[in-house]
Amino acid sequence: MNEILCYRIFLGYNDSQTKEQLVTENELEQLVSAYFQKKKLGLGYISYLSDQSQDFLLKKKIQGENYLAKQYLNNPKRLCDNLAENLRFLHEQNFEDCPILDHSERYLKKVEKNASINNSNLDFVNNYNIRTTEEAYDYIENKKLLLRNDTLLHGDYCLPNIILDNWKFKGFIDLDCAGVGDRHIDLFWGAWTLNFNIGTDQYRDRFFDAYGRDRIDVDRLKLVGCCEVFG
């Protein structure tokens, strides 16, 4: 039997973000979560409730553990390969009826918003010889048309967000950034999470090799890194 989880989310608002906008974002997450459930890639939501100050999300719990379990962290090479294989599996899914088909446009809109208020973090471009936020923004302006909407994404492809049972894929969680967009967003986060959660960048090349170098565009990968400066 599937376990049910209740999440209480306290919402803070500012002049540029209304409660209606946040509700819409949560409703979109429900839609894409239901879509992932239909494709047997996750379990989705049961219910979303809201009042004037807080939101409640009822979720089904996928049985298993994420990649942060000792069983997986203690075997980083296998973890790396498995992470890449599960990403390739996701990216090969048909996406014609996905409720979010314009992820790249949404992604760039968020970048523009954060850039306009100087919300930035250069840690995301340590591998790309970008030294200032101005350089990052200029690269985005010159290359942003490279981003495509041709792949079903998780959008936050990190070790805590994939559930396994003894190395067997069980499902994805936390799908608020999912949709049809550019695969290099997931590739960027896959490499990032290996470095962040394992504590070394030595598995970066192995991850890309296991995914398939023939499907990786280094310019688009750098573009995503620059976008995440303002993510």
Task: Label the model's feature ranges.
Residues 160-164:
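Hydrophobic residue at the +6 position relative to the catalytic HRD Asp in the kinase catalytic loop
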Residues 25, 228-231:
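Short hydrophobic/aromatic patches at helix-to-coil boundaries
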Residues 4-5, 119-125, 201-213, 230-231:
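ATP/Mg2+ or Mg2+-diphosphate-binding catalytic cores
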Residues 1-3, 165:
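Active-site beta-strand termini and strand-to-loop segments that position acidic
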Residues 149-152, 165-222, 226:
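Active-site Asp-x-Gly
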Residues 32-35, 80-81, 85, 92-155, ...:
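An alpha-helical support segment within catalytic cores of ATP-dependent transferases
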Residues 5-100:
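ATP-binding pocket architecture of kinase catalytic cores
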Residues 26, 61, 155-157, 175-177, ...:
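Generic detector of well-ordered alpha-helical packing
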